[in-house]
Amino acid sequence: MQKTIPMTAYKSTRLSGIIKIPGDKSISHRSLILGGLASGETHIHGILESDDVFNTAAAMQALGACIIKKDDLWIIRGTGNGCLLAAQKPLDFGNAGTGARLVMGMVGPYHMKTTFIGDASLSKRPMARILDPLQLMGVEIEATHGNYLPLTLYGPKMTNPICYRIPVASAQVKSAILLAGLNTAGTTTVIEPILTRDHTEKMLKAFGAKLEIEKNAEGTRFIHLNGHPHLTGQTIHIPGDPSSAAFPIVAALLIEDSDITIENVLINNSRMGLIETLWEMGAQIELLNQRQTGGEDVANLRVKSSVLKGVTVPKERAPSMIDEYPALAVAAAFAEGKTVMLGIEELRVKESDRLSVLAQGLKINHVDCEEGQDFLIVHGKGSAKGLGGGHVTTHLDHRIAMSFLIFGLVSEKPVTIDDKRMIATSFPEFIPFIQQLGGKIS
């Protein structure tokens, strides 16, 4: 068993410089999956080279795609839609929840057996929300531990198209059903009451799928996908991940006299919740050189240290920032006044019970906070005095690890995390990037 690698962050002064954040994790997974399904070659620039993404790439190779890496360019020769091969051994997704769930949707309709396994953290994450619609489509599931990994899917001879209303806002559920619809005759419809990140819809259209979106007066989206489309390989330029950018953004806002620029960051409307919330708190964040890359909105972010005040974050905003709440909680700890985060029960089924672990980490660093089943209230002091000094147990959660290292850059006393290794699942360059800007982590 590998040894844990603790890491400590110390109070830092003035972050400055320009960095380019790694590629967006959501788009990286989807690029590999759709590129592996499409006919011809897909060229991917700027892919996130992290453990999670490598695991999805390995799964696509096991299912018949050919993937070649040439420097920063990834070239995929896809199987063609409907032509995946049966994997010869279980698909091991490590910690990659997105990869596992999306590939379950993709392979579910294939008349073959596919087994999914993962690490200890992923094996605790519920899969029922993906498996329920797949069962309605005719997929049989064999799982020894309830709706958790390891599990095996047995695809039917003929898949049923479904009309499925998503019970909880989830881009992964929506995407898994749409990917299943690619190899299903007829029209598959997903009803989405609350908008979640829409990369799958945009990319399906770009690859050639016949997909239509309707919206009613209440804002509910009806996404219709015609089955068995011909998908054609594309050239994809992946913008920087806003979920990773969250950490240097919060650090620069909180550390006095900081002024940093983060280049080429995705600013898709369905991913802007954190920046909107920080603006409400008083953050100086400018969107510079706004442009479009591959159908996605992109900008450079200039971030200057700011005096923040507490706010209430409505539950409706949660889907657009679900991965950024740990970073927001750090900002809230140093803001003036109370910050209330509502409708965040989804955090309980992330890499850890992220809501509980976040509250515990704040408390051992002397932050006054209240945790509820679906909310977190942080009482900010408006200063770093008396904060920090804690040893945070990260529970194999990369976002908890990065959040409390950022906390330690700001707090009066150093903060130590028990293990830095899982940071590689989403942001391998995190520590050197922060050090490059002037942050003290060792």
Curated annotation (Swiss-Prot):
Pathway: Metabolic intermediate biosynthesis; chorismate biosynthesis; chorismate from D-erythrose 4-phosphate and phosphoenolpyruvate: step 6/7. 3-phosphoshikimate binds at K25, S26, R30, S170, Q172, D323, K350. It is found in: Cytoplasm. GO terms for molecular function: 3-phosphoshikimate 1-carboxyvinyltransferase activity. The active site is at D323. Gene3D superfamilies: Enolpyruvate transferase domain (3.65.10.10). It comes from Bartonella henselae (strain ATCC 49882 / DSM 28221 / CCUG 30454 / Houston 1). The gene is aroA. The keyword Iron-sulfur does not apply. GO terms for biological process: amino acid biosynthetic process; aromatic amino acid family biosynthetic process; chorismate biosynthetic process. Monomer. Belongs to the EPSP synthase family. InterPro entries: Enolpyruvate_Tfrase_dom, Enolpyruvate_Tfrase_sf, EPSP_synthase, EPSP_synthase_CS, RNA3'P_cycl/enolpyr_Trfase_a/b. This is 3-phosphoshikimate 1-carboxyvinyltransferase. It is an enzyme of class 2 (transferase). Its EC number is 2.5.1.19. CDD domains: EPSP_synthase. Keywords: Amino-acid biosynthesis, Aromatic amino acid biosynthesis, Cytoplasm, Transferase. Phosphoenolpyruvate binds at K25, G97, R125, Q172, R354, R399. One of its GO terms (cellular component) is cytoplasm. HAMAP family: EPSP_synth. It catalyses: 3-phosphoshikimate + phosphoenolpyruvate = 5-O-(1-carboxyvinyl)-3-phosphoshikimate + phosphate. Catalyzes the transfer of the enolpyruvyl moiety of phosphoenolpyruvate (PEP) to the 5-hydroxyl of shikimate-3-phosphate (S3P) to produce enolpyruvyl shikimate-3-phosphate and inorganic phosphate.
